[in-house]
């Protein structure tokens, strides 16, 4: 179903459409050189079964948060670690991601400190947020959903994560572990995690829909493969 059809059917309101548009914008590919194209991963449904360690140097979590209803603040977290378990059995697939909240950046130092403050993340008390889950379900040939647990600001809630397996890299040197890439998206309401009480997001019915769009791009190296 296209975005136009969804909007025509009234399934999304303006705020949900804005969050979806943000996800589409952030997911747009950037220009690549011929050399970069040769390093693109190959597409497949899921990576080979085994355990994979997230490469924190090539993995990032992005967010787009509503600012006083009408504005939008974008930023990212630069320290993402964790593990991914792939299996031929979707019920056995798992993910364990840890994000260093203090690594967030919106490119405005004063705003970053505000977001790190007790009004929002309160990083001194809650230095990390996590996403953990086991079991996935297919929603299209290369799209999956995991109903994992997001723990943020000391509050844990089940949050569906939609993701795609982008593929396995083909230019890995002999002796080095296999490398795979994923892209995931989700959305949350900050009020449900006890954050942003001063933002007045109850206007226009904002509290009924996600006001923060989240994306995560991950590269991970195999640590174990089936024999």
Where do the model's predicted regions map?
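Bacterial N-terminal signal peptides that target proteins for export
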Residues: 2-20
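Bacterial N-terminal signal peptides
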Residues: 17-29
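Low-complexity, acidic/polar, glycine-enriched regions of mature
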Residues: 33-227
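Intrinsic disorder and flexible/low-complexity segments
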Residues: 3, 28-31
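Intrinsic low-complexity/disordered segments
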Residues: 13, 31-34
């Amino acid at each position: 179903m296209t975005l136009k059809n969804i909007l025509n059917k009234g399934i999304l309101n303006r705020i949900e459409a804005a969050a979806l548009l943000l996800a589409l914008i952030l997911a747009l590919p950037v220009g690549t050189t011929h050399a970069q194209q040769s390093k693109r991963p190959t597409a497949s449904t899921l990576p080979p079964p085994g355990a994979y360690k997230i490469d924190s140097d090539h993995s990032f979590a992005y967010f787009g948060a509503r600012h006083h209803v009408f504005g939008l603040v974008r930023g990212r977290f630069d320290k993402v670690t964790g593990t991914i378990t792939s299996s031929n059995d979707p019920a056995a697939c798992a993910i364990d991601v840890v994000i260093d909240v203090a690594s967030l950046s919106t490119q405005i130092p004063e705003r970053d400190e505000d977001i790190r403050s007790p009004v929002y993340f309160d990083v001194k008390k809650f230095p990390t947020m996590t996403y953990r889950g086991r079991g996935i379900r297919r929603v299209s040939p290369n799209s999956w959903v995991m109903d994992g647990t997001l723990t943020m600001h000391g509050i844990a809630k089940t949050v569906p994560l939609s993701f795609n397996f982008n593929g396995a890299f083909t230019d890995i040197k002999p002796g080095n572990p296999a490398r795979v890439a994923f892209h995931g998206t989700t959305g949350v309401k900050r009020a449900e995690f006890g954050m942003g009480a001063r933002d007045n997001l109850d206007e226009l019915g904002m509290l009924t829909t996600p006001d923060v769009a989240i994306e995560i791009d991950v590269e991970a190296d195999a640590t174990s493969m089936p024999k």
